[in-house]
From Swiss-Prot:
Pathway membership, UniProt: Amino-acid biosynthesis; L-arginine biosynthesis; L-arginine from L-ornithine and carbamoyl phosphate: step 2/3
Species whose genome carries this gene: Nitrosospira multiformis (strain ATCC 25196 / NCIMB 11849 / C 71)
Main location group: cytoplasm
Classification via NCBIfam families: argG, PRK00509.1
Binding site for ATP: 12-20, 39, 120
ATP-binding found in the keyword field: yes
UniProt-recorded name of the protein: Argininosuccinate synthase
Localization annotation: Cytoplasm
Class in the EC hierarchy, top level: ligase
PROSITE patterns: ARGININOSUCCIN_SYN_1, ARGININOSUCCIN_SYN_2
């Protein structure tokens, strides 16, 4: 990229060591104006210090946006309508946050007249792909600066040395480092690196931040009633809550009961296997409850088709294709399937488990007790009809068996 061509760049900025160094590096290397953007998506950290840090480094245009409601309403909830799991386990807490950050960066670039965007993702992981696919999908002619693919600052020590040489303020706690590389938002918190790079080693109990261990969870269960409207949870125990407030509350309740811990090895889009640990207490409750709600409101073939398509949908999100035409097409179908997913589900939280103990829909239940009963159904279901059903469905197998017997 021609350095002289860049006039203004929007940087996804946390205020931490990496993005603080990137900010200064952009100013010095590209001789361009830097606009900072800091998103509050429920990571649990104060975002205002990022404003002070940006001002110290000479930034004139600073954006700090509270995106928690938009994050849950427009990204998390649509994903959960599909019961989405990547490789059967991962609830995509990191993956689903990147499209929103990319979207807002592009919006700010348009508002400020910036001709480039930049991020702090390394050249080794998935996030670089997720961010940049989003940028190009939303603004095809945008320029992208990925410092980790350009500079020679390949270690924490080199970053700290650069910061010291260029007068970049770094808090002492940042210099000391942390045991794990962590990423958090309202849906989850993730842990990577250090001891976790050995997939044979169990993580220390002290690593987990959002949940107690199941062994230390309360000895008494807790019951929750969750109300669904068109596939989304709208109320908890009779109280209507906004999407972000509801997920935050479920995180608290789930964490209290040791729910939502995951330790897995996943296949990154860039080709390598990576071990990560995750805490997704609220999401784990949501997933279990949503499947229960669908169990009595979705037609069998619709439910099975959704289950067949879900791995592909999850893969699209994991790999960064949220803004792709195929994801949008699948979302339209998924959303249409949720029109009648209305009612309530009761779950029991107990020592790491989410146990569904009740579900009902006054308006959309396909469960007919008169037909399903083991008692006298008063003629609601004619059992003699099953003979013809079975015989026709066995026809192809009978033909094949007869052929084999003649050979």
């Amino acid at each position: 990229m021609n350095v002289a061509q860049i006039k203004k760049v929007v940087l996804a900025f946390s205020g931490g060591l990496d993005t603080s160094v990137i900010l200064k590096w952009l100013q010095d290397t590209y001789r361009c104006e830097v606009v900072t953007f800091t998103a509050d998506i429920g990571q649990g950290e104060e975002v205002e210090p990022a404003r002070a840090k940006a001002k110290q480094l000479g930034v004139r245009e600073i954006f700090i946006d509270d995106l928690r409601e938009e994050f849950v309403r427009d990204f998390v909830f649509p994903m959960f309508r599909a019961n989405t799991l990547y490789e059967g386990e991962y609830l995509l807490g990191t993956s689903i946050a990147r499209p929103l950050i990319a979207k807002r960066q592009i919006e700010i670039a348009r508002e400020t007249g910036a001709d480039a965007v930049s991020h702090g993702a390394t050249g080794k992981g998935n996030d670089q792909v997720r961010f940049e696919l989003g940028y190009y999908a939303l603004q095809p002619d945008i320029r992208v600066i990925a410092p980790w693919r350009e500079w020679d600052l390949t270690s924490r020590e080199k970053l700290l040395k650069y910061a010291e040489q260029h007068g970049i303020p770094v808090e002492m706690k940042k210099k000391e480092g942390s045991p794990y590389s962590m990423d958090a938002n309202l849906l989850h918190i993730s842990y990577e690196g250090r001891i976790l790079e050995d997939p044979a080693q169990e993580p220390e109990e002290s690593m987990w931040r959002w949940s107690v261990s199941p062994e230390k969870a309360p000895d008494s269960p807790e019951y929750l009633d969750l109300e669904f409207r068109q596939g989304d949870i709208v109320a908890l125990d009779g109280e209507e809550l906004s999407p972000a407030r509801l997920l935050a509350r479920l995180n608290e309740l789930g964490g209290k009961h040791g729910i939502g811990r995951l330790d897995l090895v996943e296949n990154r889009y860039v080709g390598m296997k990576s071990r990560g640990c995750y805490e997704t207490p609220g999401g784990t409750i949501m997933l279990r409850a949503h499947r229960a709600m669908e169990s009595i409101t979705l037609d069998r073939e619709v439910a099975h088709l959704k289950d067949e398509l879900m791995p592909r949908y999850a893969e699209l999100i994991y790999n960064g294709y949220w803004w792709s035409p195929e994801r949008r097409m699948m979302q339209t179908m998924i959303d249409a399937s949720q029109a009648h997913v209305n009612g309530w589900v009761r779950v029991k939280l107990y020592k790491g488990n989410v146990i569904v103990v009740g579900r009902d829909s006054k308006t959309d239940s396909l469960f007919d007790p008169h037909i399903a009963t083991f008692e006298d159904d008063q003629g609601a279901y004619n059992q003699m009809d099953a003979a013809g059903f079975i015989k026709l469905n066995a026809l192809r197998m009978r033909i094949a068996a007869n052929l084999r017997n003649r050979k």
